[in-house]
Amino acid sequence: MKLIRSTLFAIFLVIFTPIWSVLCMLAFLFLSPENRYTFIGLWNKIVIALLKPLCGIHYEIRGMENMRAVLNERVIILSKHQSAYETIAYIALLPKQLCFVFKRELLWIPFFGWALALLKMIHINRSNKQTAAHSVATQGRKRLSEGKWIMLFPEGTRTPIGSTKPYRKGGARLASATDALVIPIAHNAGRCWPKNSFIKEPGTVIFSIGPAISSTNKSAEELQREVEGWIEAEMRVIDPSAYQ
């Protein structure tokens, strides 16, 4: 049954994504950058909604009040990264327009990448660390000044459940330099949509949003350790069996 459900979902994505991407590229000719984000975000909302009846994947959000308390502040979100699910869900579920930092190779994906290129995101060349750091710093400052929230995955890539990769300091460095608040997010999306897995597992993805962390008078190293400590401790709360 899971194979059938996952296959139906894949067929939906293969058919719907190119159609929506073409619609986006046409609509973007007449929309402001802010309205482009809203328009393309409808795809995310549809996908997240469809995953419930089709694959049995639901979600639960804990700590949303921590975001609503700082809606008018400069914020950098640092999130655990396990799955494609959270990258789709954040645009659909979070209350503020996000600016993702992502590898430029995503722009080369037919249809999806082409539409993505028309949004004000930060795409980096991960093979050149110096250039990537400069892009995050310069574009990040600009996007924060426009009122957007910056979204980064400090581990840099998706990690299997129960594992941790070294946290990179790019997001913490940007927060420290701009005096932005940092909101950490832990989740267990890898349980339902594992990395590199075609099969989608039914279950509930828990998103745990932490209290905003001040970057004032903190070095990037101090801030990074505080964020990592909160996320990894919270991971053991929402998914304890993964760490036994």
Which role fits each region the language model picked out?
Residues 1-29, 38, 42, 68, ...:
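Membrane-interfacial terminal anchoring regions of lipid-handling membrane enzymes
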Residues 3, 134-244:
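Non-catalytic C-terminal accessory region of glycerolipid acyltransferases
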Residues 21-45, 53-54, 69-129:
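Catalytic core of membrane glycerolipid acyltransferases/transacylases, capturing the structured
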Residues 49, 88, 172-173:
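Active-site phosphate/pyrophosphate- and oxyanion-stabilizing loops and adjacent acidic/basic residues
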Residues 49-59:
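Transmembrane alpha-helices and immediately adjacent membrane-cytoplasm interface residues
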Residues 61, 77, 100-101, 207-209:
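Generic preference for hydrophobic
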Residues 65-70, 199-200:
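A short beta-turn/loop motif at secondary-structure boundaries
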